[in-house]
């Protein structure tokens, strides 16, 4: 059996009178790819931001690797990739994007190049991130999460606006990261996206979990 890396217990959140997460309970295992699915406005992104420590829950508990974890402690361990990637990508080129924020040692440069190779982005290494396609930007954002060694990665609507080819490429990379032991949560309203890359789905409606089911066995 795979290790439980993330557990959510009785999580509640609201904005004013509007309840966006009500008594949310679920577990995620190492190497699992889970879809948080449901229509827009059902609290999916809010839950994602809470798990990543970007938003403090009103009540409830988030447990990482068996230990209760406050929002600050979740930063960096749970990596949130938003839908609007242009607000996240700042580097001069792809290598700079992956190595920014630290002095670039030869080892760090090699690690970044290996990640770009794995994500099939090496041909674009000298390009500015803004010149990439939507699918390539998603893969680059995954690369940034890998450079930070985040064990849990949350992608918010990763296939939004992508054509079939780019969607398949992003799905392939998500499954590849899961095989490397990363736990991936995919926030989506798109059943096709969930079917393409996830093994399990948690359905949300009006801030509540209405279903939690296997899509397929672990690969």
Indicate residue ranges for each PLM-predicted region.
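The feature captures the beta-strand-to-loop junction immediately N-terminal to the Walker
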Residues: 37-39
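Helix-to-loop junction immediately C-terminal to a conserved catalytic motif
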Residues: 52
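Conserved ABC transporter NBD signature motif
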Residues: 60-74
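Conserved ABC ATPase "signature" region
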Residues: 107-124
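Conserved ABC ATPase signature
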Residues: 128-132
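Catalytic Walker B motif of ABC-type/P-loop ATPase nucleotide-binding domains
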Residues: 153-156
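H-loop/switch region of ABC-family ATPase nucleotide-binding domains
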Residues: 188-189
């Amino acid at each position: 059996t795979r290790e439980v890396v993330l557990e959510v217990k009785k999580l509640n959140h609201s904005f004013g009178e509007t309840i966006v997460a009500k008594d949310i309970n679920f577990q995620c295992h190492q190497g699992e790819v889970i879809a948080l699915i449901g229509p827009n406005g059902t609290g999916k992104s809010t839950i994602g931001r809470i798990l990543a420590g970007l938003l403090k829950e009103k009540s409830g508990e988030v447990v990482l690797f068996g230990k209760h974890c406050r929002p600050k402690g979740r930063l960096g361990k749970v990596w949130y990739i938003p839908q609007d990637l242009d607000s996240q990508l700042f580097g001069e080129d792809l290598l700079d994007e992956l190595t920014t924020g630290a002095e670039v040692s030869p080892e760090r440069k090699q690690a970044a190049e290996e990640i770009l190779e794995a994500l099939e982005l090496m041909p674009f290494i000298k390009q500015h991130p803004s010149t990439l396609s939507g699918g390539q930007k998603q893969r680059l954002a995954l690369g940034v999460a890998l450079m930070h060694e985040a064990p849990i990665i949350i992608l918010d609507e990763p296939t939004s606006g992508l054509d079939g080819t780019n969607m398949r490429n992003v799905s392939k990379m998500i499954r590849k990261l899961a095989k490397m032991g990363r736990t991936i949560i995919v926030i989506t309203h798109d059943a096709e996206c969930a079917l393409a890359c996830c093994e399990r789905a948690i359905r949300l409606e009006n801030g509540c979990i209405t279903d939690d089911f296997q899509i397929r066995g672990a690969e």
